[in-house]
Amino acid sequence: MLENRVKTKQIFIGGVAIGGGAPISTQSMTFSKTADIQSTKNQIDRLKLAGADLVRVAVSNEKDALALKELKKVSPLPLIADIHFHYKFALIAAQSVDAIRINPGNIGSKDKIKAVVDACKEKNIPIRIGVNAGSLEKQFDQKYGPTVKGMVESALYNAKLLEDLDFTNFKISLKASDVIRTIEAYRMLRPLVIYPFHLGVTEAGNLFSSSIKSAMALGGLLMEGIGDTMRISITGELENEIKVARAILRYSGRLKEGINLISCPTCGRIEANLVDMAGKVEKRLSHIKTPLDISVMGCVVNALGEAKHADMAIAFGNRSGLIIKEGKVIHKLAEKDLFETFVTEVENLAKEREKTLN
């Protein structure tokens, strides 16, 4: 069951609203040296093209921090500076970027956090309290270990610390490298604070393992109404993080966009090269933003039933197939002629729907 989204305080990262009922935003992180402005800009451009709303960059040294001023001028996305250990880099970054991420486990003393808060107050930019199970503050790690309770206590402690500094322009993340702790931590903290949540499974692995872990953890939370922005952590290409994030948003019912492909897993009854056809259809129609259910079925057993509920469908027969639009057969063609005709019909339907929506 899809729950109503939890109402949270709204903050802004650049022009992107986070929380308060705003659309759930997606983000990724560049892997270039941030001081290499051109390489970093190129990666941000790739993320923008992939559909990202925000981007985070590592600030590992003073050279990176000083480069942010120029990078901000050329970035097509709101820029978040990722700070670990060295609070002074956050003070420099705050002069240029749209948000600061700090790790309370390594940023330092209350005085250092206060300095970061003061810098962010001056520029009216938000902070992310980025709690990681693997790098909790000493007092929480010693008492609880890398547990759900430890993460939640760290988040509450740091939220109170910022509130005591009269600063409420922040969001919170609670990241672990496994599904169970991730879900339980966000669930435990959600009723205790009003602040928006940044969702993610940290160090989730390669494309396959990260996609599974993230879909289970984040998809479940999103369906419960929890989450305001998200990052899929993948060891691999930047674009995949955004592709997977947007797919999770679609399949959890939080984003109405693009093609939902319905295709059978194949069996001895199929009468066409269904694997090839489904792959070609998905690739050729990936540019469509209009939400459409598209069915590609290999035989008549389930094809006609699925077609009744799909916007457009192919039902394969013996070296031929039917194209079905909104439950009605509109073409019966030889297999070789199906693909291009089907693509054209789907594109035309998308245009029709867009006119209706506008």
Swiss-Prot record:
Family matches, as SUPFAM superfamilies: Enolase C-terminal domain-like, Nitrite and sulphite reductase 4Fe-4S domain-like
EC number: 1.17.7.3
GO biological process, one term: isopentenyl diphosphate biosynthetic process, methylerythritol 4-phosphate pathway
Pathway noted in the entry: Isoprenoid biosynthesis; isopentenyl diphosphate biosynthesis via DXP pathway; isopentenyl diphosphate from 1-deoxy-D-xylulose 5-phosphate: step 5/6
Xref: Pfam families: GcpE (PF04551)
The organism's place on the tree of life at top rank: Bacteria
Statement: the UniProt record of this protein carries the keyword Transmembrane helix: no
Reactions catalysed, as given in the entry: (2E)-4-hydroxy-3-methylbut-2-enyl diphosphate + oxidized [flavodoxin] + H2O + 2 H(+) = 2-C-methyl-D-erythritol 2,4-cyclic diphosphate + reduced [flavodoxin]
Note describing how the cofactor binds: Binds 1 [4Fe-4S] cluster.
GO molecular function: 4 iron, 4 sulfur cluster binding; 4-hydroxy-3-methylbut-2-en-1-yl diphosphate synthase activity (ferredoxin); 4-hydroxy-3-methylbut-2-enyl-diphosphate synthase activity (flavodoxin); iron ion binding
Cofactors named for this entry: [4Fe-4S] cluster
Residues that bind [4Fe-4S] cluster: 264, 267, 299, 306
Keywords: 4Fe-4S, Iron, Iron-sulfur, Isoprene biosynthesis, Metal-binding, Oxidoreductase
Enzyme superclass (EC): oxidoreductase
Function: Converts 2C-methyl-D-erythritol 2,4-cyclodiphosphate (ME-2,4cPP) into 1-hydroxy-2-methyl-2-(E)-butenyl 4-diphosphate.
Similarity section: Belongs to the IspG family.
Name of the protein in its database record: 4-hydroxy-3-methylbut-2-en-1-yl diphosphate synthase (flavodoxin)
Taxonomic source organism: Helicobacter acinonychis (strain Sheeba)
